[in-house]
Amino acid sequence: MYSMYSSFKAFGVLLRLGVALFLPLLGGGCGYERLEDRACPPEGTALRWEPFGKEYLRRYCQGCHAEGARAEGHGVPAGYDFGTHEVVLARRERIFARAAGSNTTMPPGPYDPPAEEREKLAEWLACGAP
């Protein structure tokens, strides 16, 4: 029984990971926005890691993208634990491609950020995620 449960759990993790990784490819260019195409406003941004970035990631991302999430079976690839500003800076382009502005493949599920929050995330990332 244990091996069957483990197999189903592994299949579920792989299925979620596959959908998360390949769903953007199915849409082609429809709605996909790139970080390099989004300009920081001329006046810059008032958004900062604390409180905006850290709180946004805690609320919408760290349920899966946090230290220990992989151990809980979420299937998050190594290097995508968004608990520190340094990791977020290193993954800025990828975060933008999946969750900012008109990009809505992350987070999966019913707890999507409102469009206004995604726009703030886009601005923050486009301005270098200060």
Located regions from the model:
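Sec-dependent bacterial lipoprotein signal peptides
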Residues: 1-28
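Aromatic- and Gly/Pro-enriched helix-to-coil junctions and flexible linker segments
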Residues: 28-130
